[in-house]
């Protein structure tokens, strides 16, 4: 912890080291030290001011309207212990903890601090502070979209509670030189070339340097015209089927009497088919009835003589 080393000369700003992000700002905070080192009056009494939370530390800036020997008070995360958040019933919430003196910090020993948030927001501030301390301990400090990348290094942020409004935003003053990682961008990231200026209003036409499309992107070639006649209506041969596929001829009429529905695949024998000889056994009745008269006359005479005997 350091005393009177984190404020500007006019006591209206906080000095934030280069590479750190401002995570939160809480005005109207009261700082006191219930237990402190003896031999110094800088910790006596209650101080009112603005509290800043960065990626690595907490900075308290005493209000410039208050005459107090403590103008600023800086507490790094690694020197704070025993942090608690208290919620009294009839008073404002506050954060309490123990802080160790930093080397060359303007004092020695340790002290117990108490931060009372008169405007509320103590719980949110404590939660974000614990999160930032954990991230800093892992080597990945929290960042915000409000980070400033500049050729300078130390940022000064106004600390008065009622000075930062939408009509009058907080002023930023920069001092020092940045580390190597925050230097000027490489040549490839300079100003954009002339062809990448603002877009024309209404997109009237392409900027200078954009020629018309080549001919091959224009109308399609001749081979891609209307389809040939062969792709139109089908020819006459693809029309209705011929008459031969209509009703069957007269010879395919109903079967004679006594002929039942033949099983599938057992149609009647074709014309000129001869019956099997008598030695093959008797034919079924329906098959004999289905034979034509000329087939009956061709039976051998021996079968006739057996019938008459």
From Swiss-Prot:
Keyword tags: Meiosis, Repeat
Organism in which the protein naturally occurs: Homo sapiens (Human)
Superkingdom per UniProt: Eukaryota
Ranges of the Sequence repeats in the UniProt entry: 175-181, 182-188, 189-195, 217-223, 224-230, 231-237, 238-244, 245-251, 252-258, 259-265
GO biological process: egg activation; male pronucleus assembly; meiotic cell cycle; positive regulation of DNA-templated transcription
Function: May play a role in meiotic resumption and pronuclear formation, mediated by a WW domain-signaling pathway during fertilization.
Protein name per Swiss-Prot or TrEMBL: Postacrosomal sheath WW domain-binding protein
Ranges spanned by the short sequence motif PPxY motif, renumbered to the chain: 186-189
Tissue occurrence: Expressed in testis.
Composition skew (Low complexity), residue ranges: 251-272
One Gene Ontology cellular component: sperm flagellum
Compositional bias annotation for Polar residues: 298-309
GO MF annotation list: chromatin DNA binding; transcription coactivator activity; WW domain binding
Domain GRAM: residue ranges: 45-87
Region of interest called 10 X 7 AA tandem repeat of Y-G-X-P-P-X-G, as start-end residue ranges on this chain: 175-265
Region span, Disordered: 251-309
InterPro entries documented for this protein: GRAM (IPR004182), WBP2-like (IPR044852)
Keyword Repeat belongs to the record: yes
